[in-house]
Regions:
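Short beta-strand element of Class I
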Residues: 82-85
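Conserved glycine-rich SAM-binding loop
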Residues: 67
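S-adenosyl-L-methionine
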Residues: 1-62, 70-78, 101-132
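Conserved beta-strand/loop positions that form the S-adenosyl-L-methionine
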Residues: 64, 87
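Conserved SAM-binding loop
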Residues: 97
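C-terminal substrate-binding/active-site "lid" region of AdoMet-derived donor-dependent transferases
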Residues: 160-195
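Conserved SAM/SAH-binding beta-strand->alpha-helix loop
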Residues: 90
Length: 195
């Protein structure tokens, strides 16, 4: 038995093993385009950040579902050769990212200026990035909401209609979850996509 020690909450689910509809749902999304209209705030955020990305001319790293942006800061520190976009749907969480003058996240180094935090809908932002022909060097999905109820499969990134965009963005994918079934399902979805 493997004992994992950490401060993450224990995930409970009515699902044992891979979701029985996983293959069907993933294959459906791989065969059909996601045509939902873009939300205005995400479209505007993309247009603004697209200019910054072009000006930088560096490899692009996504830190999706970044919460308060602590992981984004550390990724930026570890990858000075790249630009990092930390993205979350919650403006409240992002507002808790330390700014100059606040002591937190290892006393933020003000020389780390290769990242931006964005409040966006990832379903839209990832598709916009694909349309703009962006290719990532890395994509971090660190502890996304696992949606552990079996009926919520399509709320998980690998079960959602935007999953093909995650694949098209490319790059080294770093997925972490406190629910092992989430990781196993994501791996199966990648296999179904030929990755």
């Amino acid at each position: 038995m493997i004992e994992i020690i950490g401060d993450s909450r224990i995930i409970t689910s009515n699902q044992n093993g891979l979701n029985e509809k996983l293959d069907e749902v993933v294959l459906k999304h791989l065969q059909h385009d996601f045509k939902k209209p873009y939300q205005t705030h995400t479209l505007e955020a993309f247009k603004k950040i697209e200019k910054w990305v072009e000006q930088q001319g560096k490899p692009i790293i996504f830190d999706s579902c970044c919460g308060v942006g602590e992981s984004t800061y550390h990724i930026a520190k570890a990858h000075p050769e790249a630009i990092i976009l930390g993205m979350d749907k919650s403006a409240d969480r992002l507002s808790k990212h330390p700014v100059d003058g606040e002591l937190s996240i290892d006393d933020l180094d003000s020389n780390i200026n290769n990242y931006q935090l964005l409040q966006v809908n990832l379903n839209d932002f990832w598709r916009l990035a694909v349309e703009a022909n962006w290719t990532l060097s890395h994509h971090y999905l660190l502890y996304p909401n696992p949606w552990p109820k079996a009926k919520h499969l399509q709320r998980r990134w690998h079960g959602s209609a935007v999953f093909p965009s995650i694949i098209e963005l490319g790059g080294k994918l770093d997925l972490r979850s406190n629910w092992f079934t989430y990781v196993e399902e994501f791996q199966r979805a990648l296999q179904l996509a030929g990755k």
